[in-house]
């Protein structure tokens, strides 16, 4: 019985490729940091701009475009202000 288990284990080891744990851990570490171009930190690292890191002029435009609603306005907002 032990001989069969050893033979089966050897057979399974040949079928399943061995994984290198260092490579898989490295790939997971890059997904949300300096190497990820979709995050603000990644954009700063690469020196690029985009949705996560807009240029200064775009930021100022967005702030100016916001509608300031006075406190006396009833909630929900009237259709004209939306």
From Swiss-Prot:
Keywords: Mitochondrion, Ribonucleoprotein, Ribosomal protein, Transit peptide. The keyword Transit peptide applies. Residues 1-22 form a transit peptide. Residues 37-46 have a biased composition (Basic residues). Transmembrane segments: none annotated. Residues 34-56 are annotated as: Disordered. GO terms for cellular component: mitochondrion; plastid; ribonucleoprotein complex; ribosome. The keyword Ribosomal protein applies. InterPro entries: Ribosomal_bTHX/bTHXc/bTHXm, Ribosomal_bTHXc/bTHXc_plant. It is found in: Mitochondrion. One of its GO terms (biological process) is plastid translation. Belongs to the bacterial ribosomal protein bTHX family. This is Small ribosomal subunit protein bTHXm. It comes from Oryza sativa subsp. japonica.
């Amino acid at each position: 019985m032990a001989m069969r288990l050893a033979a089966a284990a050897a057979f399974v080891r040949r079928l399943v490729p061995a994984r290198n744990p260092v490579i898989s851990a490295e790939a997971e570490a890059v997904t949300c940091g300096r190497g990820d171009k979709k995050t603000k930190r990644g954009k700063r690292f690469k020196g690029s701009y985009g949705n996560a890191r807009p240029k200064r002029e775009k930021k100022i435009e967005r702030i100016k475009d916001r509608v300031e609603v006075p406190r006396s306005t009833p909630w929900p907002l009237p259709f004209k202000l939306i």
